[in-house]
Amino acid sequence: RRQRQMCIRDSDMGPLIDANALKSVEEKVKKAIEQGAELLCGGHRIGTKGYFFEPTILINCTQKMDIIQEETFGPVLPVVEFTEVEDAIAWANDCEYGLTSSIYTQNLDMTFKLIRALKFGETYVNRENFEAMQGFHAGWRKSGIGGADGKHGLEEYLQTQLVYLETKG
């Protein structure tokens, strides 16, 4: 993998934004392990220059762990296994944050069931979490104060005025 500044064309992954972000991700991973998560891979900073952190997968995570309850903003994937979709929905919605959810399935009926049930401002289906510029970055609950992208975000700064004009012609 090529970790370097994102402005370099063949980068696979760039750095975190600053030293505080790197420290926060390190601390969250460490605390998750202390709380019982198992480190499957990653979990460490890369090198001594820059703010690079290894892509990290944690398994055996529980709902009470900070890594689940708080937004991490780093390359960390806490994994939880479910056998019943209703349990996964309830578990996902049992959080103070609601920025994004992701669904991976080829079952269209299941897709729409999940979209209706998940309480998140954005849902990505069979793709990574990267919004379209014309979209609306809309976190629910403690994930922001509404959308700020695209036409919908711009409209938040405008005030509508209706004018009705009749002329004798």
Predicted regions and their residues:
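Short, small-residue-biased leader/transition segments that mark boundaries at the very start
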Residues: 1-8
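Short, conserved active-site loop motifs that form the nucleotide-linked donor/cofactor pocket
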Residues: 4, 37, 76-77
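Short linear capping/connector segments at secondary-structure termini
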Residues: 9-14
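Short beta-strand to alpha-helix junction loop
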Residues: 16-26
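Short secondary-structure junctions
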Residues: 36-45
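Conserved C-terminal structural/oligomerization subdomain of aldehyde/semialdehyde dehydrogenase
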Residues: 45, 52-169
